[in-house]
UniProtKB/Swiss-Prot annotation:
Expressed uniformly in tentacles (at protein level). Signal peptide: none annotated. Ca(2+) binds at residues 10, 12, 14, 37. GO terms for cellular component: extracellular region; nematocyst. It is found in: Secreted; Nematocyst. Binds 1 Ca(2+) ion per subunit. It catalyses: a 1,2-diacyl-sn-glycero-3-phosphocholine + H2O = a 1-acyl-sn-glycero-3-phosphocholine + a fatty acid + H(+). InterPro entries: PLipase_A2_dom, PLipase_A2_dom_sf, PLipase_A2_His_AS. Its main location: secreted. It comes from Bunodosoma caissarum (Sea anemone). This is Phospholipase A2.
């Protein structure tokens, strides 16, 4: 399974977000990870 940093849904291997707009508790960090995943 995916390993995601606690408090985020996008930082780590894969993501656990239900959709693109879902970020988790640490929104600024998750936003950066989500943008990086899209590269």
């Amino acid at each position: 399974g995916a390993t995601i940093m606690p408090g985020t849904l996008w930082c780590g291997k894969g993501n656990s977000a239900a959709d693109y707009l879902q970020l988790g508790v640490w929104k600024d960090t998750a936003h950066c990870c989500r943008d990086h995943d899209g590269c």
